[in-house]
Each structure stands twice: as structure tokens, then as C-alpha cells.
A protein has these predicted regions:
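Pocket-lining segment of extracytoplasmic ligand-binding domains
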Residues: 87-89, 97-98, 163-255, 259-260
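N-terminal (or domain-start) structured segment
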Residues: 24-86, 101
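Bacterial signal peptide processing site
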Residues: 19-21
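Sec-dependent signal peptide recognition
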Residues: 2-10
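C-terminal motif of bacterial Sec signal peptides marking the signal peptidase cleavage site
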Residues: 15-17
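Bilobed "Venus flytrap"/periplasmic-binding protein-like clamshell domains
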Residues: 28-55, 117-183, 295, 299-304
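Acidic, polar ligand-binding/catalytic clefts
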Residues: 80-116, 126, 194-198
Length: 316
């Protein structure tokens, strides 16, 4: 372990080179974490905001945006340094053109694969929807077109031979979806959130709601086309009296930009793992972290993160 003086000396050197990607205000470097307030990644941003300044002299700010789909753009265009991005979204943004970019976002880099977020498919019991194939011809809420939830829902449907058009998609916030479900204006809704999710709990509080499982056979078909989706489950009883529900999950990647200084990203990565118990107290999904899997990024690792993982392997 380096001495405290050397630690801070190295961090000051690292941050001194952060003119473009890390904003300076009153000579104090600012690391911006992209987030949507009230959404699933906001608690992690708040937890990092508490911990990172204790390890190096920088101020962590939340860079607010209206849509989680903006995270990639904020990082790629230099308006944020860190964000939590779904692995499927990160891979698509890095390898191909997307709706907001005519060319791949090749400046994206991975820091750590952290935890899995389940996809929730909820339907009215009266709709007689029992599996994904029963969604054909139904009115299904996909939240916002272009959002990570819609992206994962679309990949899930395509994996079993359906398209979004097959399900008569409806675009609306989850809060509006609750009203539409009550009124019988829609039959089902795709949602995404770490369990227990306040939004999912609110939907499941509506009488007559049920989770629709996505079974192993369907997940195997989905993974054949979209390997970043995998099997996970919604624990029994956390939204009322329901059994454990099989579903699709997608991993969340802490991502950054390629021009962040190597030393800065090294210390961010190191701080993340040395402070993991504290972070997990503030953001329980981090308890899922598989320390043997954290570097399995679908896009290239940032050199600073790769340096941390190499050192970790050497000193284990």
C-alpha cells in the first residue's frame, strides 16, 4: 500500500492533466456522473459522490438528463465523465450507428461490470397473457422509444421472433401506464428496475396485476441473438404474494471516455472496489458484484481500469 502522501501526490498529478474531460471550477477538478434523478442509477451516483472525494481531491457532480438513453451521448460528447450504461446499449453504441449518432461511439470505454438489472413484464390477469408469445396483438407499454428499457424489451421480443410492431407499442411514463392499466387501455407493460423497485411496486399494487415469466427455453432463444441478455429472477414476495419469477436480466457497466487520464480512472476504479462495503450499504445492488467478472466489459476497458485489474491479479 502506498503512503498517503504519495497517494495524494499521484492523484494531483493525474487530475492536473484533466483540462478537457474533467472540468475545473475554482481549481478543484469536477468529475461529472450522468444520471436521471429518481431513476435506478441515481442512488449509485449519490453513493459515489459521497465516497470518491474522500480518496482524492475532486468534487463529484451529478450531470442531470431527462433520459437514460442520453448517458452515452453525454460521455461521448465530453459532457460527463462517468455513467452507468446497460451492457447491451454500450455494445450497440460502440459497434454501430444509433438513433442519435450516425457513426459508432468509439470513445466509450468500460470501467467495471457491476450488477444485473431485471426486466419486468407485467400484465392484467384478465388479458390472458402467460408468456412472451401471447403479447402478439396486445397493447404493450415500452416506456419511451429509444430508452434502455425499450431497447432491452425490443431485443427480448426479437429473440422469440416478435417485433415491437407486433405488440402495438404504447409510449408513456410508468406513472401513466398505471392509469392506463387501471382503465383497461393497455394490456401489459415492460419495466426495468433494481428489486425492490418503487415504480414496479406501484404497478403491482393495482388489483389484477401479474408478472409474466420469461422461461429458460425462451431465454436460450433470446441469448442466441443477443448474448448480453441472460437469465435472472425476481425474488418471491417482494411485490406482494407472488412466487419467484424467471426473467431476462441485463448487466450494468460503469463507463467512461477514452481520453480520461489513466491515473484518474485507475484511482476511480481502485476507490470503487476499496469502498465497496460502504457503497453497497447505500446502493444494495452492488452486493451482486462478481469480483471475477467485473472486467468482462463488452467494450474495451479504459487503460486505467485495466491497470487496476492487472495489479489486482498480481497481488492476489
Amino acid at each position: 500500500m502506498r503512503s498517503g502522501c504519495r497517494f495524494f501526490a499521484m492523484v494531483f498529478i493525474a487530475l492536473a492533466g484533466c483540462r478537457a474531460p474533467v472540468e475545473k471550477r475554482d481549481t478543484v477538478p469536477v468529475v461529472r456522473i450522468a444520471t436521471v434523478l429518481g431513476r435506478i442509477t441515481n442512488p449509485l451516483a449519490e453513493a459515489l459522490n459521497k465516497v470518491l472525494p474522500d480518496h482524492f481531491p475532486a468534487r463529484v457532480e451529478v450531470q442531470k438528463t431527462d433520459l437514460t438513453g442520453d448517458y452515452v451521448r453525454l460521455i461521448a460528447e465530453g459532457n460527463a465523465e462517468l455513467a452507468m450504461i446497460q451492457t447491451d446499449v454500450a455494445y450497440a453504441a460502440y459497434t454501430q450507428s444509433t438513433g442519435d449518432s450516425p457513426s459508432p461511439r468509439r470513445r466509450l470505454r468500460g470501467v467495471a461490470v457491476l450488477y444485473t438489472t431485471p426486466l419486468h413484464l407485467i400484465a392484467l390477469q384478465s388479458s390472458r397473457i402467460r408468456n412472451l408469445m401471447d403479447l402478439r396483438g396486445k397493447r404493450v407499454v415500452v416506456v419511451t422509444i429509444g430508452s434502455p428499457t425499450e431497447f432491452t424489451a425490443r431485443m427480448t421480443l426479437e429473440g422469440v421472433g416478435l417485433s415491437v410492431a407486433d405488440v402495438h407499442p404504447r409510449q408513456m411514463p410508468l406513472e401513466e401506464a398505471i392509469r392506463a392499466l387501471r382503465a383497461g387501455e393497455v394490456d401489459a407493460v415492460f419495466g426495468r428496475g433494481n428489486d425492490p423497485s418503487p415504480s414496479i411496486r406501484q404497478i403491482m399494487s393495482v388489483p389484477g396485476m401479474t408478472f409474466i415469466p420469461i422461461g429458460r427455453g425462451q431465454i436460450d432463444k433470446i441469448r442466441a441473438y443477443h448474448p448480453f441478455l441472460h437469465s435472472t429472477s425476481i425474488p418471491a414476495g417482494i411485490y406482494g404474494n407472488h412466487p419467484e419469477i424467471e426473467t431476462v436480466g441485463v448487466e450494468m457497466l460503469l463507463a467512461c471516455r477514452d481520453d480520461l487520464p489513466v491515473d484518474l480512472v485507475y484511482w476511480i476504479t481502485r476507490t470503487l472496489f476499496e469502498s465497496l462495503p460502504v457503497l453497497a450499504d447505500s446502493f444494495p445492488p452492488l452486493r451482486q458484484i462478481d469480483l471475477e467478472h467485473v472486467q468482462a466489459s463488452p467494450i474495451p476497458l479504459h487503460s486505467g481500469a485495466a491497470r487496476f485489474y492487472r495489479e489486482r491479479e498480481l497481488f492476489q
